[in-house]
Each structure stands twice: as C-alpha cells, then as structure tokens.
From Swiss-Prot:
InterPro entries given in the database record: CFAP298
Compartments in which it is found: Cytoplasm; Cytoplasm, Cytoskeleton, Cilium basal body
Annotated gene: Cfap298
Superkingdom in the source lineage: Eukaryota
Name of this protein: Cilia- and flagella-associated protein 298
Tissue note: Expressed in the trachea (at protein level).
Similarity comment text for this entry: Belongs to the CFAP298 family.
Length: 290
C-alpha cells in the first residue's frame, strides 16, 4: 500500500493509504471526502462546545438583540421552550447573542465536552505524527459519536435553524464564512505531488511506480489555484534545530571574544626567558638608577 501524507498548503492534514493500482479519480474523491469530513467534525465540535456553555441557537430574528428589544418587538423563542436539555438547564448568558443561554447542567455538559474531545482526537492532525491512517469510517464514527451525545443531552432535538442540526442533516450554509473557503468541492479538487498534478485519468502507479512501500506527500488544492508551493528541503523542526545550533555557536564565539584577555602574558609562567635567567643566576634582579 502506498502511504499518502496529505497536506493543504504547508500544513499536514492526515495520512491515507491506497494500492498503487488505484484510479486517481477514485483516490481524489476519497481524499476530498476525508478532508471535508474532518472539517465538518471540527465545525461541529466548535458549535457543540458553545451548545454546552450557552444552550440552543436563537431564532435568526432574535439573534444579537437585547432583552428589551426582544420584549418590545414581542418576539418569542418557541423552539427554545421545546428543546430543553435533559436534567434541566442552567442559565448562562451568551454575550454574543447567538444562543438562548439555557445551558445543560454540569453532568450533561461534561457528556458533550468529553465526546467533543474524543471526536477531535480521532481526526486530529496529531494522527500524522502517530502514524495513524484516517479513513472515512473514522470520520463517520466521530460524527455518530457527536450525534449520539447531542441526542442524550437534548432528547427533544434541536431547532431546525441550529447549525448543529443543519450539519447533521447536511443542510449547513457556510456562505460568507471562513469555513466556506476551507471546503473543497469533490469535482473541483486536485492532488499534486512533486510539482505535478495527479491527473484523474491515470492510476497512482503511473506516477509513483510499482513499489507498494512508497511514501509520498500529496497536496490537495482547489482547481484554478495553480500549483502549490514546493516542499522545503528541510522540515520546520529541522530548521528550528539548525537555527538553535547557530544561535548557540554565536553565543560561544561571543564569550570567547569577551575572554580574549592578554593580561595573562605578564605572568611568570608566560616568560620564555625565565629558565635562561635562572641558570645564569640573574633571576629577580631589579635594576634601578642610583
């Protein structure tokens, strides 16, 4: 199996393995699904952390309004009254004004937070360092765990406009957000290796050869963005160690310059004529005018 270290730009994303005989059409789709799936997990984790702290999403027409404005406009959060967390709620006001402030109790909050940490770990970039391959099954498992935790804490479900529910139903609207810039459409995705685009009409082995023990770094890119930057000759960690070595070397040279003192040359042991004077018996003779 060929090992693919997938990157976006210079940033590591995940490890994937595939046979050399894999069609690049299929491989590009697989890499893109895992890449977008990881983004989805991270978006959900961010929103579920907010859910644990401040409760469900307010209706769009109530977001950002003060209590006085809501009362004046006679607006009502009907879904908020239905979607009550299991075990009761604790009021924690959302300063941003996106959520209704009726957060789950401490026990239910920990259920959400623990699940979020587990889901993050499953698709973390640290899996690259650990040598763990991330598959679409792992992404789906992380999503299922998050869905299960939300159902435990909110058995009545979430409002239809809550971004968590919309993510689970694949109805999320990312337009105008930073997250939209990160997502790559499957039909628009490109894989690059060694400054060459891996054409979808070919097989992986057409580029990397028949050796199934090959490990390559591929970069996923949106079509039309051009070739990604080449990989640096040394890694960021190696560069850091090199800079540290040169810094230490400069400090050592600086100390040597500071200690370059010639006063030691006046010491008796530095006098190369001392032995001669000793044998001639003229040691310690002081000359002074009368």
């Amino acid at each position: 199996m060929v090992v693919l270290h997938v990157k976006r730009g210079d940033e590591s994303q995940f490890l994937l393995q595939a046979p050399g005989s894999t069609e690049l059409e299929e491989l590009t789709a697989q890499v893109t699904r895992v890449y977008n799936g990881r983004l989805k997990v991270h978006r959900l984790c961010t929103e579920i952390e907010e859910l644990a702290e401040h409760g469900v999403f307010l209706p769009p027409n109530m977001q950002g309004l003060t209590d006085e404005q809501i009362e004046e406009l006679k607006l009502k959060d009907e879904w908020g009254e239905k979607c009550v967390p299991s075990g009761g709620s604790v009021f924690t006001k959302d300063d941003i004004g996106r959520r209704n402030g009726h957060a789950p109790n401490e026990k239910m909050k920990q259920v959400l937070k623990k699940t979020v940490e587990e889901a993050k770990a499953m698709v973390s970039k640290k899996q690259v360092e650990a040598g763990v391959f991330v598959t679409m099954e792992m992404v789906k498992d992380a999503l299922d765990q998050l869905r299960g935790a939300v159902m435990i804490v909110y058995p009545m479900g979430l409002p239809p406009y809550d971004p968590i529910r919309m993510e689970f139903e694949n109805k999320e609207d990312l337009s105008g957000t930073q997250a939209a810039l990160e997502v790559i459409q499957e039909s628009e995705a490109q894989l690059w290796w060694a400054a060459k685009e891996l054409r979808r009409t070919k097989k992986l082995s057409d580029y990397v050869g028949k050796n199934e023990k090959t490990k390559i770094i591929v970069k996923i890119q949106q079509r039309g963005q051009g070739a990604p930057a080449r990989e640096p000759l040394i890694s960021s960690e190696e560069h850091k160690q090199l800079m540290l070595f040169y810094h230490r070397r400069q400090e050592e040279l600086k100390k040597l310059e500071e200690n370059d003192d010639d006063s030691c040359l006046n010491s008796p042991w530095a006098d190369n004529t001392a032995l001669k004077r000793h044998f001639h018996g003229v040691k310690d003779i002081k000359w002074r005018p009368r």
